[in-house]
Amino acid sequence: MAAPKKVDLKAQFEAAAEAAKKTKKKPDNATLLKLYSYYKQATEGDVTGARPGGFDFVGGAKYDAWAKLKGMSADDAMTNYIKQVDRLNRE
């Protein structure tokens, strides 16, 4: 019986990803980093590769935010992403 729940979560995640693209208010940078890191963790798993260096401040911030989620399951990342988008759309 776990399979339908997983499919439902995936559908909710995909709907949230579409809703995030259509928000009327631009989120602040901290919220954008949370959305990015949860999305990447949900879709790709733990961060890999070297941290961007030099003057790539945005790349470094994205890498760091994603790296903080190391070990989080895809399901937990999807759930957190959905909650973050819901919160954003309520504002």
PLM region spans:
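A charge-rich, low-complexity, intrinsically flexible signal that marks solvent-exposed coils, linkers
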Residues: 2-54, 59-91
